Structures are given as structure tokens and as C-alpha cells.
Amino acid sequence: MDFAIKGDILYSKSLNKVKECENSYLVCVKGKSEGVYKKLPAKYKGIKVYDYTGYLVIPGLVDMHLHASQYMFIGLHMDLKLLDWLNKYTFPAESKYKDIRFAKKAYDIFVKDLTLTATTRFAMFATIHNDATLYLMNELEKTGFKGYVGKVNMDRNSPKYLIETTSKSVKDTLKWLESCEDLKNIKPILTPRFVPSCTDKLMAELSKIMKDKKLPVQSHLSENRAEIEWVKELVPKAKNYEEAYDMYDMLGTVSNSIMAHYVWPDEKGIKLIKNRNVWVAHSPSSNRNLCSGIAPIGRYLREGIKVGLATDVAGGSYLSMFRAIEDSITTSKIRNCLYDSEYYNVTIEQALYLATLGGGEFFGKVGSFDKGYEFDAIVLNERDIPTVLMSELTLLERFERYIYRSHTNVYAKFIAGKKIV
């Protein structure tokens, strides 16, 4: 169904530039944006108009990295650093998804809660369990989401209750890929958990699958300094952590790649990633909660590295991308103050870009209201924020105030032209 949205429309044009269109019309035709108009053109006369006059309308937000299976313990267990946290809390929790009855209950809660947020696209980790992963993908598909979900691969340095043999990991991955072929909007993404949990043989096999099936890849990179030292021991032929992926063409040379965190880059590694089809999934909440560090996002933006924002549930303690936007700004200021005075803070314009168009490009023409982009939009209700300044604020200022003062659920939500909320 073709339609238009009337409201105060704000979206990114580039990293440092936004477009503000007060009391305007955003037109959707066949699931794609036809652009923003001050007056509705005559050729669209008679189409349905959703009247959100006075409400702020922005593109749907893109969560570049989260673990759906960990939502069950979000907000808990923030007392350890990454590797100990995985072993004590995360791996035992993920092992529960072997029981499909448990998985259905947990994923039903997750999908219901995600639906009410501003997130419209995502790249998501499930677990090693095929049945549970397929259930998650099907539920997301039925709800109307678009994005990627990965069956996790791990054949070493994992507890007995959550580990695969190399052959079983490969076999199950191929079976999973075959089982989700009929899904239209939720697509598979290869997901080696991280180098410490995947043998060289498994990485080589996954690389073959990636090339044969033309699949994107997601994993973790340089999140924690102890992890980096461990990778040096496990893969001595790699000069750095980045090269441990690049050896298997998983660093944006063959297909698109998402690398979560990238808190501690190697100087030579930055040169590998720069100008590649690699997106850094910046996860400020998780980086803080697990005491991993503060990623140098200001530098990445100056270097031209692709960056998107992420909640990283459940290392991240929220499902709200608004809070990820806020944290991306505040943590950049802390890093700038303590370490990198030569690199700028992340601005509100840049944070909006990272949460929409910056991450959205991984999915194609996503994250903008320019003509031809997929119609992902959210409507925000600011009326719970009392103020006498409303008439004096720009749309960008209203958005800035919203992310700092309100983390309520969205008022309305559209994904590829379909009204979800």
C-alpha cells in the first residue's frame, strides 16, 4: 500500500549534515521512499496519509550487533571482564537454547520487546543450536523485521556443554543455510564467534561457505586486550588480530563484514580495514560494562572507516538504540579528554548518521529518506518532555533532547513500508 506520513521530518544527508523538514510529507511507494515534500504532490492525491503533525519522524535505527540469546540476562552480571564473563555467565546461559521449549519462551520475549523499540534493522547473533536459531529467524520474519541472524560457530576453547566438533559445525551450518532459504526478510550471516573459539580448519571451511554462498560475515575484533594477546598465541602466523580474519578473506575483500567493538586497533590493521567493506559495530555500553575500553570512533570517522552503532545485548545493558546514540557521544568525549585530544568528539549529527545511514549502508539503500531508499521510519512522541522552548528548537535539537531525556518506546514504526507499530 502506498501512503504518506505527515510530520516533522529529520534525517542524515552525510556524516556531518542533516535535513530538517518541518510539517512536511514523506511519501512511500511500494515500500520505498519517494522523497520529502512541503506540500503533497498532486500525483499522490488520494493516498492514505498518516497524520503525525507535531511529531518527530526519523529513519528507523540500525543495531549492528546484538546477541538475542543473551537478552534473558540483560542488566545482570556486569562484575567481570570479557573472557571471565563469557565463561561464568554467557556460555551457561546460551547452552539453555539446546532446549527448544526454553528457546521459544526466551525468543518470544525478545522479539516482542524489540518490536516496540526504534530498531528496524539488525545483525544478530543466535547460538550454535540450529532449531533455536531457525525459530528466532521465523519469529522476526513474521513480525515484519528485516536483517541478519547468525548461527554461531565455535569448535575450541569452549565448555563441553557449548562446543561443536569442526565437522559438526560445518555440517550444521550448511543444514541451517538450507533451512532458511525461504525466508524473504531475515537473512543468514556467517558467524564465527571470534578467533579464540574457532580453529584454523573451521575458519577455512567457513570461508569456503562464505564464497560459495556469497554470504556476509559477522564476528568480534579486538574487544579486550587479554583477548588480543590470546589471539597472538593461537594464530602466530597472523601479524595482528585483523590479519587472523583477513587470512580467510573475512575482512571485507569478498563480502561485507561486521566486526564488533574494535576497541584496540593495530596500526597496520587499520590500514587493512580502511577502504574495505568492513563495518565497525561500535558498542559503547558493552565496552564500558565489561571494562574493555573506549573505541577510538573519532579516529575511525576521520580515517574513513565504516562505522555503525550497536547495543550488544547483553554485554550492553539496554535494547534502546537511543541510549547507544547517547553513549557514543559521551564516551567519545571521555576518550578525547583522556587520550585523543587530536581527534574530535562524536557530534549529535554524526551519532544520528551512525545509527541510520552509517550502519544502514550494510543492508543496501537503508537509513535515509532520499528517493529510492527502503522506507524505514519511526515516529517519536516528545510530549512526555515538558518544555516552554518547543517553538524555539530545531528538529535536530528536539532529537538531541529526546535521546538524553526520553527512552520511551516509539509512537509508530514502519519497516520497508509496512506499519509494525
What are the functions of these language-model segments?
Residues 74-145, 169-183:
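Alpha-helical scaffold segments that flank or form the walls of functional sites
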Residues 243, 247-256, 297-386:
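His/Asp/Glu-enriched, well-ordered alpha-helical/loop segment
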Residues 14, 374-421:
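C-terminal cap of metal-dependent C-N hydrolases
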Residues 131-263:
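Metal-coordinating catalytic core of metallo-dependent amide/deamination hydrolases
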